Curated annotation (Swiss-Prot):
GO terms for cellular component: extracellular region; host cell presynaptic membrane. SUPFAM superfamilies: omega toxin-like. It is found in: Secreted. Keywords: Calcium channel impairing toxin, Cleavage on pair of basic residues, Disulfide bond, Ion channel impairing toxin, Knottin, Neurotoxin, Presynaptic neurotoxin, Secreted, Signal, Toxin, Voltage-gated calcium channel impairing toxin. Pfam families: Conotoxin. Omega-conotoxins act at presynaptic membranes, they bind and block voltage-gated calcium channels (Cav). This is Omega-conotoxin-like 2/7.
């Protein structure tokens, strides 16, 4: 009996928290497809797509310390 009451209270609490934290912006769902189309026309480069590398003939550290690697992928004290 106690377990059933606890389950009912937990479900009510979770349901209330979902409604409280829900987005209350007006026409938020209706504007979503329009925003997606706009984003596809002008995609923003993410940090994962950006390539940070060291140019040729510049000193490199073999990538041991988490720094940028050579653009060519070859390092022998200088980028090759």
């Amino acid at each position: 009996m106690k377990l059933t009451c606890m389950m009912i209270v937990a479900v009510m609490f979770l349901t209330a928290s979902i409604f409280i934290t829900a987005d209350n912006s007006r026409n938020g769902i209706e504007n979503l497809p329009r925003m997606r189309r706009h984003e596809m026309k002008k995609p923003k480069a993410s940090k994962l797509n950006k390539r940070v590398c060291i140019a040729d003939d510049m000193p490199c550290g073999f990538g041991l310390f988490g720094g940028p690697l050579c653009c060519s992928g070859w390092c022998l004290f200088v980028c090759l």
